[in-house]
Amino acid sequence: MTAKSKVVALEHVVIRFSGDSGDGMQLTGNLFSDSTAFAGNDFATFPDYPAEIRPPQGTVAGVSGFQVHFGHKPVHTTGDLCDVLVAMNPASIKANMRWLRPGTIIIFDSDSVTEKALEKAGYADDPTVDGTLADYQVVKAPISELTKEALKDFGMDNKSMLKSKNMFALGIVMYLFNRELDTVYKYFETKFKGKDQVIKANRTVLDAGYHYADTWELFTNTYRVEAADLDKGKYRNITGNIAAAWGLMAASEKSGRPLFLGSYPITPATDILAELTKYKNLNVKAYQAEDEIAGIMSSIGAAYTGCMAVTTTSGPGLSLKSEAMGLAVMTELPLVIIDVQRGGPSTGLPTKMEQSDLLQALYGRNGDAPLVVIAARSSAGCFYTAYEAARIAMEHMTPVIMLSDGSLGNGSEVFRIPKMADLPSITPPLAKANDPDYMPYRRDEKWLRREWAIPGTPGLRHRVGGLEKENGKGNLSTNPENHQLMTELREEKINRVANDIPLQEIYGDKNADLLVVSWGGTFGTVRTAVEGLMEEGKSIAHAHFDYIMPLPRNTEEVLQGHKKIVVCEINRGQFAKYLRMNFPEYKCEQFNKVMGLPFTIGELEAKFNDLLK
């Protein structure tokens, strides 16, 4: 680095990598995130890409982005406006104009400017010279040509050389933030093991980008974000889907029940299935079924045999699984259903996030078929939510739906790997061999749960199925009084789970003028917006719900004592409707967004300020 570059310390930074779907922006963002983790920063990421595998190149609709928000203090959100934009073509600038703050550094591949590229992006003239970007710091670099120049002696064709241009851009950004290149080198060596030429080519381009930024003095300042004050422990960069997979494995180990996953690939939940297939050595059985129904039915069968059973899906698949979920309710078998929500209805927006499956999760089954519903609040938190879903399912002999979403599942955060000894115990109610008083639907008095009778255990022969059962004995029954009793017992069993979950916390003054209510993946942005207004002296508090069905038993106390209540969610008000149904005496305002994008801190603060007037 030249002596002329001044190193400026920053509290936090938001970087957005943006280009065509084939430009490798997801990989570039992930590699920078890995370097961020090794630098000791706290961070959160937001991948944003089209639903098409190869959308039209050079168009705004085809832009793929990856945002990283990192800092030396706790980071709860993926960031609103970006401080640095890496734009690989004109369409990337067009697509991201609304995410730029005054003074944003735009690192732009000047080789991408052609008449056709400008036309596809909707520009009449080059935005880097016509004044469109006058409020920003535009750093133009001939990234494509310099990539080819760096690889001229490798005997590669033009198309192959340009596949590495994202590494040139990454090199520039690594220089800008004073990052060591070792983490990227290590990735090359692992990813391309045995392909020395490929490793050398990528290293060459990465180095070329780094040294170009240095030699040509592209930046007046470079930047450094000091390491966050993190608790001692082992950390890694983890996505929500991988965190969920790990949480399931931890629950399996803790409970002593083998893990079985029966699932069908669906965006954005597939990575859970893909991750669990790697752990056959840990007695994980992952079965890729031919469809959604086969996936959940295989899991119900596995639960019957004593496995910790799981199925994963997204909104359309949850609809297909509805009848089978009713079977799991009727048989009272432990089952975890993970729904990584996406934009709907129907096929909807497969790669975009939404929270619109809540009412389906609560009520989307025929008959009165209650089950437990909980929601993850962060990518790293998916580990603990999956673990808790498995604990409740096995200890209370019930299906549990865990709600995540695309931004949590694909986004990543710093994750401190916990010690098994620090995780809550999981003790399933296993039936004992040769129990002379055993009956399939005999229940304990405290939780109303039936015992888990593992097939093959002496003296525990029994039948299960979808027809109504006689209380206690478990025989088929169409008796009206018995059906009334069994329906009430199944409902009360779920209600009693409220005695086994934490009380609802409220952040801030319990009698604040405005109570902000949220659930699921909106936690980070809502909490950050509330904290900002608290610092201004505003009378505001925040209640974020992780447990949906049943609600925490002190929920009504939390809702009391406020002039206004506003429920923030990425749907048209489903949790607000649910609260009104359970607590009709409390008036809830709504703040909803259904654009396939998370809330921004700015729009939340504007809404809260308006309600506080």
Located regions from the model:
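Active-site cofactor/cluster-binding pocket
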Residues: M1-S255
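Thiamine diphosphate
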Residues: H12-R101, W246, A251, L259-F260, ...
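Short glycine-rich or small-residue beta-strand-to-loop segments that form or flank ligand, phosphate
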Residues: V13-D20, A169-G171, L259-G262, A309-T312, ...
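A glycine-rich phosphate-binding loop feature that marks nucleotide/adenosyl-phosphate handling sites
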Residues: Y49-P50, F188, V205, E226-L230, ...
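Short gly/pro/ser/thr-enriched loop/turn and capping motifs at secondary-structure boundaries
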Residues: P50-R54, V113-A117, L146, I293-G295, ...
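Gly-rich Lys/Arg/Thr-decorated short loops/hinges at beta-loop-alpha junctions or inter-strand turns
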Residues: A51, E149-L151, L218-G233, A251-P258, ...
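Short beta-strand segments
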Residues: H69, A87, I107-D109, V139-P142, ...
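Flexible, low-complexity linker and terminal segments
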Residues: I238-G247, S255, T385, A390-K613
